[in-house]
Amino acid sequence: QMCIRDRNRAVDSTFNCISVDGEMSTNDTVLGLSNGLLGNKKINDKSPQANKIYKSIENIFYGLSKDIVLDGEGSTKICKIIVKGEKNSRDSKRIARNIANSLLFKTALFGSDPNWGRIISAVGSTQIKYIDQNSIDIYIGDKLVVKNGLGLKLSKKINQIMRKKEIKIIIDLKKGKYESFMLTNDIGHEYI
């Protein structure tokens, strides 16, 4: 039972946090197999190594999730979108997924365009009522590009970050303690 629960938790925090083109694959499967032939002592929730095993499974799944995104048709970049400061985990996931699935955002990634307006647009299109655009901060890499809903002057460093193969974007809503992430890629000529 623990193995099934840990597999499901790890799938939810890795494979279910990726978007290549916003479509669900009909043939993706994750299996966990154990035959018990080694005769090792059974591990349960109270076992000292239980959390270590879960973290190992999650790390393997995260690496495989990244590979799926990087292998997406025509993908040239991978982007980790982190939405933090949300009132609940459901809405933070919803916002992160909406940004990750946005074609406007994905094409901006492809063009190395630090167009934070496309990020704000994807946040707003979730229609979550309590989001206050005037309190949103956005970081591209470690550089603040939007403070309290207002765009800042973009430095040349932002353009360098946008040309990297791996990019991190943080959206801080400053409304609560919940945080979620999505891994996504750009969409360019080869995808079309």
Which sequence ranges carry the predicted segments?
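Short, small-residue-biased leader/transition segments that mark boundaries at the very start
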Residues: M2-I4
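Long, well-ordered core segments of solenoidal/helical folds
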Residues: N8-S13, I99
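Glycine-rich, charged/polar anion/phosphate-binding loops
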Residues: V11-V20, G63-V69, S121-G124, L152-K157, ...
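A glycine- and small/hydrophobic-rich beta-loop-beta segment
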Residues: G32, G36-F110
